[in-house]
Amino acid sequence: MLSRVARCSRTLNQVTRNGQSGLFSAVLRTSIRQNSTDSPASNNANEIYTKLSDTKDPQRNQFFQYTWGSWLTNDKSKKKQRETTFSIEGLTLFIDRINQLESKLAQPKSLEGAFVLANNKELLGSTKDKVIVRSIASIHEGKHHRVYKITLNTGKELVLRIPYKLDSDVAIASKLKSEVATTDFLKLKLGLNVPRVLAYGVDSNNEIKSPFILQEFISGELLMKKWHPLLPDSEETNKCLHEVIDPIAQFQNKILSVTFNKFGSLYFHDDVEGSLQNDVPYEGETDSALSNRWRIGPSVERQFTRNKNKLQQSIIDQYNGPWDASNPTAVLESVADIELENAKSKLSLINADAGANENDRALITKQIKTFENLKKISPQLINDKSKSIMNVEVLFKPRLYIPDLDPLNVIQHSDTENYFIDFEGSTIKPFILTSYPKFVAYQGAKIYNLEEDVPGYKEMEELEKQQYEFMYYKTRNERMWEFELNKYRHDLIAIASPHIKVLKSPYLQALDVKNGKDYLYVEGSIVQLQAMWEAYVANELVNSKDTKFPIEYTAEYLDQHQQELSDYQLETVSSPFSATGGWIPQDMFDTLKAQGILVETKDGNYKVETEKVLENPPAQPEEK
């Protein structure tokens, strides 16, 4: 998929201003390439010339449309959610206004409905004239936002990130505020290589007419280009894998150096409510310019916003924190609470609809049962004072967690300098409740030595060998990550314990609920605890002294759950593109449609013609 994601666009050339400022023709390029990186030239770039004053120019529309892929169902509505219309004229006016501000380190300054970090004003460059946008290129259509590259008449380049309308307005605003503050913290407090943010807007009431982040453009290649996770063991392979794992592990190590005073997410001081402004986020700040810069507010972890559009904000606010550092169990319970409330809200809407689908009602009812079980067991999952867990108190302290630490979000700016991007959804939580970065995480059966752990491996057919080799390579990569964690933070290595992984699995599975039937994985992880519960109680690993398992399951219920889980897994692996939610890269979609593999139905959706697939099976795209 990387080759698809890293499509190229033509190198930007400056264009001459045509007439007076505000009337010149801006160049809009709709070609796609990876976020904030340079790529080889492409002859497929689609250039659009438009006057900034002509806000109704129909040529602009395609510049804002989602083009990176299509969906098998509800394609039009999903693309509509991903339209990123903004004011091109307003952008150039806003940027010039920033240039007139004094450069100093202070709280973000309100400007025409947006907020400016004036200390980063130098990103605009210098000119005796007005700062003007010369060209705009669409360089990446991501999972949560679209990225545009802005070229100025000063020769400087910026990135404009526009979020998709996938969440409520309140959720989008909170996520933007927290991401900018987190980026600012990483830069100013920890001195890490992250893009500097120039300005941000949390809604459409600004000159750009859209929520946005305007930040530094970082040139370079993605670290992902060096990631080859399934290479056979060799000295060269070990070196290649470490070239990717090491810088990310070092970045995490620096993040873990700060212990916070609460669980939640980072914001600027003025972006949290008054009752939270008196509480410093961490102790020991000696720089007066930073002592009142950040505060801890409600968590923006994705489970508090994902698929919560129909849940009242007042209910969400009851469960998204912040929480006191002395109460880590509240972090566990909050996820069960929010998912249970969300399921109950959906059931109420279904019950109020006379024409509701009975299958939907049955599905939601089962979800409610699972999240009631999760709510019951969450306070007991891990004993935060257990003597059997090494450095348990350290593991439960509040630390910053970035969910998208990934080589796709690392730009190699030079041979020795890596820049990290994308801090959406970052949260402060106990380290013991975090998961490994997805590029190294592996939840399957572990194989540490092919010949010792797999009986008869040498005599197997090649295809069967490859299946076990895949499991071995995934195990190897995760172990390499754990070795790096142990090297930098031996005091936190207990997170690698298989028992800790099993105990926190219900919580992590709940965090990963995306589709209606994903509750089955949550229930399965709870059921898994039953066999070991007595041993966990005896060793004080769980927060309970009762050897009786907290959830009472009947044999009939367990059989039904196992059957439904097996059916769902079979449905997932046998349904083309189910892993991507029915999303297909646009070039592949067009090809499959031309081949007759994808056929449009009467309701405007698409179905896969099985016989055509057998003739010419498509490759599965990676989840976007």
From Swiss-Prot:
Main location: mitochondrion
Keyword Flavoprotein: no
Gene3D superfamilies, alphabetized: Phosphorylase Kinase, domain 1 (3.30.200.20)
GO CC term, one of those recorded: mitochondrion
InterPro entries listed in its UniProt record: Kinase-like_dom_sf, Mito_inheritance_9
Family that this chain belongs to: Belongs to the AIM9 family.
Listed name of the protein: Altered inheritance of mitochondria protein 9, mitochondrial
The encoding gene: AIM9
